[in-house]
């Protein structure tokens, strides 16, 4: 297996313009494909997940052109639901941001379409979304294991009264919200359980509004969507920088700054993961906010005990930042780590122990006490981009760290290690 050993880093300083947000990129691509008119998307993320969405749209007859660096996409909308010319199988890798929204959107047509992906995708639950779509008339079969992809879709979604479980993934609600305006009937969506990652729903609602569709939101517990609507291209749309990707650089600034400035997001960002900066501030770093940037300056870091349900992806970065904080850090209400690219609670606990930390892994929490001195270890990444990027922070000590399968960062940030090296002064 390929590996990358990062030597100890003495200081991190400088600025980085963030690649586009994965969450925003894939939502914007789907809405542009469903919309009337031509849309020009700029600062699109070039990564595996976005390529899976683009490949699927192409197979569904959507015409688009990409710039040489794949960050600008000119896409001609279908002016309504996506249609396949015949029976079709779409391979979506391990891209939840493609699988969930497409599973819903493709229930508007009449074609037979199979959605499948990598082995890990077949372990990521989708049953709650399928149950909700069936309540709206969709005809869906499981091809292998009940409640998991691959799925066979045969259209049939018309809207109506629908319940969705909000406790596993906000992507299920996102998928229903983006599909419902194109259904023939009005749709009322009721959310059962505690809605996880609520800020991601704000991204969805924000983008739908940009594409000309408004819905009624009753305190995130009930959404009313008029049927028979159309999305309309906004013309040009700039994709915000990825706030989850910003977390690694901001944390590096907190641990070994200097000052690190990330551009492409700021105080007006629609992504909930910008709140990661508030957590670093609580831990002792200094944060400066601009409209289009966030800067973090080193401080003496101390442990925190916090509910991280609102920023589950960025919270992973706090788990490795905790190695540099005084005291025991507890991250709570993070059960949905278990249904991501890998079981991130298990993976994080396992790898933190390798570098010497004392770790308590609960059903939905993790408690981390740093060692007096970090140990050099080979870090397993579980084909999970965030594990690789989180554990790069271990090199901000006087100990090297070896990252196994470093190319797994291609899911959201193909040149992550080059960018980190550019801003780092070796010890």
UniProtKB/Swiss-Prot annotation:
GO molecular function: 3-phosphoshikimate 1-carboxyvinyltransferase activity
Cellular component terms per the entry's GO annotation: cytoplasm
GO biological process terms held by the UniProt record: amino acid biosynthetic process; aromatic amino acid family biosynthetic process; chorismate biosynthetic process
Pathway assigned to this chain's UniProt record: Metabolic intermediate biosynthesis; chorismate biosynthesis; chorismate from D-erythrose 4-phosphate and phosphoenolpyruvate: step 6/7
Active-site residues annotated for this sequence: 313 (proton acceptor)
Binding site for 3-phosphoshikimate: 22-23, 27, 169-171, 197, 313, 336, 340
Keyword Manganese appears in the UniProt entry: no
Gene3D superfamilies: Enolpyruvate transferase domain
Reaction(s) catalysed (UniProt annotation): 3-phosphoshikimate + phosphoenolpyruvate = 5-O-(1-carboxyvinyl)-3-phosphoshikimate + phosphate
Protein residues bound to phosphoenolpyruvate: 22, 96, 124, 171, 344, 386, 411
Compartments where found: Cytoplasm
Coiled-coil ranges per UniProt: none
Keyword terms: Amino-acid biosynthesis, Aromatic amino acid biosynthesis, Cytoplasm, Transferase
EC number: 2.5.1.19
Top-rank EC class of the record's enzyme: transferase
Keyword Lyase in record: no
Xref: Pfam families: EPSP_synthase
Stated role: Catalyzes the transfer of the enolpyruvyl moiety of phosphoenolpyruvate (PEP) to the 5-hydroxyl of shikimate-3-phosphate (S3P) to produce enolpyruvyl shikimate-3-phosphate and inorganic phosphate.
Subunit architecture: Monomer.
Family stated for the protein in its record: Belongs to the EPSP synthase family.
Identification of the protein by name: 3-phosphoshikimate 1-carboxyvinyltransferase
Organism expressing this protein natively: Salmonella heidelberg (strain SL476)
